[in-house]
Amino acid sequence: MANITLGGTPTRTIGSLPEIGSIAPKFIGLKSDLSPFDSNELDGKNIIINIFASIDTSICAESTRKFNEKVSTLDNTVVVCVSMDLPFALERICGGENLKNIIPVSVFRSSFGNDYGVTISDGAFEGLLSRSVVVINSNGSVIYTEQVPEIGQEPNYDAAIGSL
């Protein structure tokens, strides 16, 4: 369980992020165009999973934009932006802003939050996902994690990118 804050108010997640060196849990969801997503389709690639509560918050949208920009020059690397948002919300921001270097994925019907330990267990955002980042290498191993301590803060983009 991670202790985090939302606007300074303490809250918790149901578990912990996957351990460094472990094989990343596979997951499914829906892409913003309503097609199915299966993380197996990314086998052999470096994956940055940008996890957040809702694309409709300014920090979540900004993290999506920044990761889109930062990975544009990286080979064999993809950013998967994961939230409990409906695919329509993800399409409105990601499609509307032509963010081509990311894959927006809604996990509103999957066990992702439990499998990655990022479901918020209490407070105003209960049931949503905590802001965090997981980086997976091309062999499927977790090489970097960050549980952002305050939901209103941005993740450490440079540390995530630098872990590759």
Residue ranges, per PLM feature:
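Chalcogenol-based redox active-site neighborhoods
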Residues: M1-L164
